[in-house]
From Swiss-Prot:
InterPro entries: CbiD, CbiD_sf. Keywords: Cobalamin biosynthesis, Methyltransferase, S-adenosyl-L-methionine, Transferase. It catalyses: Co-precorrin-5B + S-adenosyl-L-methionine = Co-precorrin-6A + S-adenosyl-L-homocysteine. GO terms for biological process: anaerobic cobalamin biosynthetic process; methylation. GO terms for molecular function: cobalt-precorrin-5B C1-methyltransferase activity. The keyword S-adenosyl-L-methionine applies. Pfam families: CbiD (PF01888). Pathway: Cofactor biosynthesis; adenosylcobalamin biosynthesis; cob(II)yrinate a,c-diamide from sirohydrochlorin (anaerobic route): step 6/10. The gene is cbiD. It comes from Brucella anthropi (strain ATCC 49188 / DSM 6882 / CCUG 24695 / JCM 21032 / LMG 3331 / NBRC 15819 / NCTC 12168 / Alc 37) (Ochrobactrum anthropi). Its EC number is 2.1.1.195. This is Cobalt-precorrin-5B C(1)-methyltransferase.
Amino acid sequence: MNDETAPTNKSQEKAELRRGWTTGACATAATKAALTALITGEFPDPVGIILPKGEVPYFQLAYEGLGDGYAMAGIVKDAGDDPDVTHGATIISTVFPAPPGTGVVFRAGEGVGTVTRPGLQIPPGEAAINPVPRRMMTEICEQICAEYGLPADIVITISVPGGEEIAKKTWNPRLGIVGGISILGTTGVVHPFSCSAWIHSIHRGIDVARAAGQKHVLGATGSTSEDAAQALYDLPDFAILDMGDFAGGVLKYLREHPIDKLTIAGGFAKLTKLAQGALDLHSSRSQVDKSFLWTLAEKAGAPESMKDQILFANTALEVLELTQSIGLDMATPIALKAKETALETLRGAPVAVEIIVTDRSGNILARV
C-alpha cells in the first residue's frame, strides 16, 4: 500500500490542516513595516513580529506607500485552511506622527468597523480593534520609536478594502459594529475550524444585550427557527444571538452572566441532540440517538410495531414524520428534555428558559 492509497484518520487530517494568522497579527505586522518606513524610508519585507505566545511569523508585504509625513503597508490575510470570511482581505496600516504626548491612537479606516453600542471590550465611538491587537501594535510602536530615540506619539489607521461587504457575513451588524470588520485575535494564530471565534461572538452578543438592559435573548440553531421565534417576540437585533450549533456557548456564558430569559429555538433534529444532553449540536460532534427517540415515542404511546422503524430510521426528521403519521406529539417531550439540559447547564443561574421546536417550514411544533 503506497501513501496515496493509505487510509487517513481524522487526527491525521486535522494535523495536516494549515494554520493562518488573525487580522490582529496582520495589522501589527503592517504597522511595524509602515512605521519602520516612516522613520527610515525603507520597508522591511518580509516583516516579522512576536506573537503573544512567543512565536515569530514573517509576513510578505502586498502594499507599500510612502508620502509626506505618512507611510502605509498592507498584508493579505492568510487564514490557512480555516473557512474564514476575512481570508484574502488586505489589512492596511497607515501611520503618521501624532501631537506630542498623545501616545498611540487608533482610527478606523475604510472597511474597519466602529463600535456604537456599550457592552463590548472597546467603548462606543472607538475603532473596532480589539484589546490584544491594540496592545501588540502599541508595543511595536514603542519599541521602534525607542530604537530611534523618538516619542511613541503615533496615529494608526487600519483599513480593509471591501471590509464593509465582508462585515455583512459576520456578527458585527448585530453587535452594533458599523462600517466594516473587526480587527481580532488573542494569540495571533487562526486554528483551522476552531469554534473559538464563533463562541467569542456569542459572548460579546450577550454582553451587548446586557449592557443595553435587554431582559430577553434568543438563540436559534438556524434562520428558520429564528424567524419563527421572532414572529412571536420581535426582539431587537442585538437580542438575537448567533447560537447555531453552540448551545453550550450560550448556556455556559449565561450561567456566569445571567439575563432574565433565554429562548432557544431550533429544528427537531438539533433540539433532539440538546434533549440528549449534547451542548455542541454540529453533525460531526454529536449524533441523534434513535434509541433515545424510541424511548420517548414509546412513552408517548407509539406501538411496539413502530420500534424498528424508529431505531433504523435514516434521520430524526423521518422519526418525526413517522410519529406524526399516527398522531403522536414527539416535539413536546423533546422540548421538555431540551429544557432540562439547558437548566442543568445553567446550574441554578437566574435565567428562565423557553424552548421552541420548529419544522423545516418554520411552523412551531412545541413551545415549553
